[in-house]
C-alpha cells in the first residue's frame, strides 16, 4: 500500500463482513452489515496543538480498533478497501 496519512489521520483495513449467519444461511451483499472494527495499517505523525507541539498518536500500525458505523472515508487502493479517519473517530483499541 502506498498511502501515508497526514496529521492525526489513521488508515484502517476493515474486517471482512460476515458471509453467513450462525444458522448457516448465506447473506447477500446487500444485506451485510458494515463491520465496525479493523486493523490499523498506517498512522500519521499526530495533530499539532495550539501551542505548536505535535501531539503523539495513541494508536499504531497493527492495532485492532473499534470505530463508529459511519466513521472515515472509504478508499480503494491497489485492489484493497481501506478507511481513512481521524484518530478521534476510533472508540477503542481491542486487545
UniProtKB/Swiss-Prot annotation:
GO terms for molecular function: ATP binding; metal ion binding; protein folding chaperone; protein-folding chaperone binding; unfolded protein binding. Pfam families: Cpn10. It comes from the Bacteria. It is found in: Cytoplasm. GO terms for cellular component: cytoplasm. GO terms for biological process: chaperone cofactor-dependent protein refolding. This is Co-chaperonin GroES. It comes from Chlorobaculum tepidum (strain ATCC 49652 / DSM 12025 / NBRC 103806 / TLS) (Chlorobium tepidum).
Amino acid at each position: 500500500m502506498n498511502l501515508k496519512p497526514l496529521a492525526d489521520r489513521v488508515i484502517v483495513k476493515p474486517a471482512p463482513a460476515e458471509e453467513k449467519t450462525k444458522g448457516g444461511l448465506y447473506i447477500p451483499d446487500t444485506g451485510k452489515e458494515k463491520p465496525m472494527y479493523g486493523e490499523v495499517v498506517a498512522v500519521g505523525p499526530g495533530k499539532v496543538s495550539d501551542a505548536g507541539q505535535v501531539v503523539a498518536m495513541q494508536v499504531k500500525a497493527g492495532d485492532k480498533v473499534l470505530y463508529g458505523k459511519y466513521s472515515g472515508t472509504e478508499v480503494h487502493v491497489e485492489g484493497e478497501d481501506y478507511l481513512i479517519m481521524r484518530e478521534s473517530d476510533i472508540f477503542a483499541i481491542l486487545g
